[in-house]
């Protein structure tokens, strides 16, 4: 939702308000919990609209999310906080289509999609022993409380998979494309805790799209919040325990400051060490009269080379994403942010022509999004995201991805937990 008009609204709030910097999911979740206890707050958002990474544009009847984003319905905190029915969630098929040696192979969860059992068994992704190891891994990660995964020993995912006996073939042809598609990490160097948690979530729920785009998630979180407590186009220049100073020079006082921004911005404002590197992506959208695939699968590049990381047809998943008679195609490229838009589009078309034939040249380019900080790197050891640290400084709190795990689940949970900590610290003064 575009809230640009809010920047002109009255800021005369009680002096004891909590100042939340950032109107992404973590900031909104924090505000909702504070509101339950009637704690005054104000949200300051640098962008002209809320949602953090979850933004959506509508162009000529096509719904374009800013980058490849999905909602995993098995996320515990998302199930608790969000109304899935109102979001109109539409699921991808449980599995993926992986391109290997110039051919497409359908890999599906045989328990949830039994009609694709034979194609899954026939796919040249590894040995029968590898398939049994996958089944064993799925059983192991689904035991007990999902949060207990973050108490396990941590190591790079590549090392973890090798320790479980997986062959080089299945690592290269299945796990690398899978992890590249989910975590933008084709070398699978990220935390094995993160990998195991993601693997569990994929096996327990659907990968889905809200019918009106990913921005609908933030819009739903915002609906219960007082509109005059959210101020967009308000970049914070500096913070201190008693308030913040905006880029405009305006000072806003409060009883506490909660940083709910992306990792690099949190580090800047808090004056702490910058987090590790970022995973960037380029997301290109095309319109076509005929889709390149007929089923609602994510298409992954398992060739070990090429520019394209993944391809989806959102309009097959949720018909609302494209006007009648058209389909929406989304293509993700990892990194390559130094290549200009025209060159990226030309190279992507050339590569996809090898995949799908000359009809790719008839696709109409709609828009290209460049996301420099699509995800932070997630090396081991990853901290337990269910445990929030106390205030970084007296009166200053941090929620969201900084020092934790990125993703919808953890943004919602960290926002709620940080609000709980603020409430606890404010209790003696109420």
Please place each PLM-identified region on the residue numbering.
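Conserved flavin/dinucleotide-binding core of flavoenzymes
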Residues: 6, 320-430
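A short alpha-helix-loop-beta-strand transition element characteristic
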Residues: 56, 79-100, 166-173, 278, ...
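Dinucleotide-binding Rossmann-like beta1-alpha1 core, especially the glycine-rich loop
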Residues: 60-148, 155-157
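Active-site/ligand-binding neighborhood in enzyme catalytic cores
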Residues: 126, 133-238, 242-243, 254
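Mid-domain catalytic core of redox enzymes
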Residues: 6, 237-346, 354-355
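N-terminal Rossmann-like FAD-binding beta1-loop-alpha1 element of flavoenzymes
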Residues: 16-43
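Extreme N-terminal leader/targeting segments of oxidoreductases
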Residues: 1-18, 36-37
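Glycine-rich FAD pyrophosphate-binding loop
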Residues: 35-59
């Amino acid at each position: 939702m575009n809230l640009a008009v809010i920047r002109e609204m009255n800021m005369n709030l009680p002096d004891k308000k909590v100042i939340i910097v950032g109107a992404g999911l973590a900031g909104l979740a924090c505000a909702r919990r504070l509101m339950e206890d009637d704690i005054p707050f104000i949200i300051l958002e640098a962008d002209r609209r809320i949602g953090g990474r979850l933004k959506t544009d509508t162009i000529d009847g096509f719904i374009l999310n800013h980058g490849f984003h999905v909602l995993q319905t098995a996320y515990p905190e998302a199930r608790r906080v969000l109304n899935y029915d109102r979001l109109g969630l539409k699921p991808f098929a449980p599995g993926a289509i992986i391109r290997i040696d110039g051919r497409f192979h359908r890999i599906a969860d045989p328990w949830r999609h039994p009609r694709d059992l034979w194609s899954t068994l026939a796919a040249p992704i590894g040995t029968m022993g590898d398939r049994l190891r996958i089944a064993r891994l799925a059983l192991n990660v689904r035991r007990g409380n999902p949060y207990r995964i973050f108490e396990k020993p941590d190591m790079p995912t590549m090392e973890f998979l090798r320790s479980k006996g997986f062959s080089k073939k299945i690592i290269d042809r299945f796990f690398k494309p899978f992890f590249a598609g989910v975590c933008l990490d084709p070398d699978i160097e990220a935390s094995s805790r993160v990998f195991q948690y993601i693997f569990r979530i994929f096996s327990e729920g659907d990968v889905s799209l809200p019918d009106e785009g990913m921005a609908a998630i933030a819009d739903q979180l915002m609906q219960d919040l007082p509109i005059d407590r959210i101020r967009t186009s308000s970049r914070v220049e500096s913070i201190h325990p008693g308030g913040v100073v905006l880029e405009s020079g305006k000072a806003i006082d409060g009883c506490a400051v909660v940083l709910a921004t992306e990792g690099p911005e949190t580090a800047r404002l808090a004056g702490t060490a910058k987090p590790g590197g970022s995973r960037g992506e380029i997301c290109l959208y095309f319109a076509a009269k005929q889709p390149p695939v007929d089923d609602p699968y994510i298409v992954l590049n398992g060739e070990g080379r090429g520019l394209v990381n993944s391809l989806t047809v959102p309009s097959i998943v949720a018909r609302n994403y494209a006007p009648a008679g058209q389909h929406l195609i989304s293509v993700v490229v990892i990194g390559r942010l130094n290549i200009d838009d025209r060159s990226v589009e030309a190279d992507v078309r050339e590569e996809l022509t090898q995949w799908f034939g000359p009809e790719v040249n008839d696709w109409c380019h709609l828009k290209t999004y460049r996301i420099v900080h699509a995800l932070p790197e997630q090396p081991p050891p990853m901290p337990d995201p269910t445990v929030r640290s106390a205030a970084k400084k007296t009166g200053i709190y941090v929620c969201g991805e900084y020092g934790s795990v990125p993703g919808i689940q953890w943004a919602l949970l960290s926002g709620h937990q940080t609000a709980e900590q603020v409430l606890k610290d404010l209790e003696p003064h109420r």
